[in-house]
Amino acid sequence: MFINRWLFSTNHKDIGTLYLLFGAWAGMVGTALSILIRAELGQPGTLLGDDQIYNVIVTAHAFVMIFFMVMPIMIGGFGNWLVPLMIGAPDMAFPRMNNMSFWLLPPSFLLLLASSMIEAGAGTGWTVYPPLAGNLAHGGASVDLTIFSLHLAGVSSILGAINFITTIINMKPPAMTQYQTPLFVWSVLVTAVLLLLSLPVLAAGITMLLTDRNLNTTFFDPAGGGDPILYQHLFWFFGHPEVYILILPGFGMISHIATYYSGKKEPFGYMGMVWAMMSIGFLGFIVWAHHMFTVGMDVDTRAYFTSATMIIAIPTGVKVFSWLATLHGGNIKWSPALLWALGFIFLFTVGGLTGIVLANSSLDVVLHDTYYVVAHFHYVLSMGAVFAIMGGFVHWFPLFSGYTLNQTWAKIHFLIMFVGVNLTFFPQHFLGLSGMPRRYSDYPDAYTMWNTVSSMGSFISLTAVILMVFMVWEAFASKREVSTVELTTTNLEWLNGCPPSYHTFEEPAYVKI
């Protein structure tokens, strides 16, 4: 029955599909918000009213894209679908908890939308810093609703993380060790550990903010012996691991795609890749204050956070060069998925280089809160995470649906998206270097040219999003079924047919090592 299957589901494939659909829908909302931002900034002068409504849109854009698009698709969608298939498990360890993880997200999303509908909205930025987020600057329920929304999304992610850790450690076939699991499984494991360790700190921080706003506590109010900088430390102790949570599953997917379309049986430097991911996960927890170089920390503290941040470039470099080595000498098949992977490797590296620039505390004091930072993190997210999602989608779409996408449309789609995002975000480096600050709805005329170019790019990206919807419709309408899949010996997820049956591995898998 429909309700039993989709509302009360305990099947990892169905829940994965729900996550993918929810993430795609939220992605449309987030894209719409970003188009509003770029429309406002397309020329000097006001389009939408005041800065409050602008900042509400910016805040909602960030939350929607992070918590309701990237995380549900990468961890919930691809994670749920692929992890059990890749390790030969019949399902996730806690199938009902898996369902709850998903169904906490729509209410969370509704709370976030409600926060923008009542009062003046939460125009705090996604960081929700007090005193701007306090009850003086933001009276009314908007920020409280945003906090509750984050609580629900956080609980959802923590439950999901527990589920993935248990599944990956306990549900492998007896003969399979952790070092024989595919890299995507490793990436989800590291991501889950990061979620489990970082989200409780965010929960603590926003709960304190909630009591500051409603119960007269003074955790972040100097008048009562509190300190708003404490909130920043708590938030960024979560916030920095969070950005690695957003990109690590992408690393795993890119490893699979690069290997598959190079005609290789395994990625180059498997153990190096695993240790690089674990190193990135560990280092991600000890660099948080690089987001706070301008709050007046000691020079020795700044020196430490500068060097620690730069160290992350080493394992990241290991991954980039291992991907290139995987491609090297392979029998390259120029599929759309490989194009996304190549685009990812190039653009993620560019974003990483601007990250190295920002790691220097002396330079960051000048560049902090300018469009240089916006350009940096959109290169690693809008062209890192999103390119990985798109690559994973066009690669595994035949597995999920049983149908194939039109390869020509898929390549055209990649091209449009590639041009669009680069045209949107590359000029923002110039704006940042010439001092244009973030989070303002208007700007001096001197910045007009690059803002106009950037806004044009965003509309090209919008075209790509619409084309993707068409591509998916076309695939389901044409019903080109999958005939054969290559390289199944080292890609277990394809072994059960396309799409796999409702229950796979009903008896324990026999794995010969």
Curated annotation (Swiss-Prot):
It is found in: Mitochondrion inner membrane. There is a cross-link at residues 240-244 (1'-histidyl-3'-tyrosine (His-Tyr)). Cu cation binds at residues 240, 290-291. It catalyses: 4 Fe(II)-[cytochrome c] + O2 + 8 H(+)(in) = 4 Fe(III)-[cytochrome c] + 2 H2O + 4 H(+)(out). Binds 2 heme A groups non-covalently per subunit. GO terms for cellular component: mitochondrial inner membrane; respiratory chain complex IV. One of its GO terms (biological process) is electron transport coupled proton transport. It is a multi-pass membrane protein. Residues 41-50, 118-140, 213-227, 287-298, 358-370, 434-446 are mitochondrial intermembrane. Its EC number is 7.1.1.9. Keywords: Calcium, Copper, Electron transport, Heme, Iron, Magnesium, Membrane, Metal-binding, Mitochondrion, Mitochondrion inner membrane, Respiratory chain, Sodium, Translocase, Transmembrane, Transmembrane helix, Transport. O2 binds at residue 244. Disulfide bonds: none annotated. The chain crosses the membrane at residues 12-40, 51-86, 95-117, 141-170, 183-212, 228-261, 270-286, 299-327, 336-357, 371-400, 407-433, 447-478. Its cofactor is heme; Cu cation. Component of the cytochrome c oxidase, the last enzyme in the mitochondrial electron transport chain which drives oxidative phosphorylation. The respiratory chain contains 3 multisubunit complexes succinate dehydrogenase (complex II, CII), ubiquinol-cytochrome c oxidoreductase (cytochrome b-c1 complex, complex III, CIII) and cytochrome c oxidase (complex IV, CIV), that cooperate to transfer electrons derived from NADH and succinate to molecular oxygen, creating an electrochemical gradient over the inner membrane that drives transmembrane transport and the ATP synthase. Component of the cytochrome c oxidase (complex IV, CIV), a multisubunit enzyme composed of 14 subunits. The complex is composed of a catalytic core of 3 subunits MT-CO1, MT-CO2 and MT-CO3, encoded in the mitochondrial DNA, and 11 supernumerary subunits COX4I, COX5A, COX5B, COX6A, COX6B, COX6C, COX7A, COX7B, COX7C, COX8 and NDUFA4, which are encoded in the nuclear genome. This is Cytochrome c oxidase subunit 1. It comes from Dugong dugon.
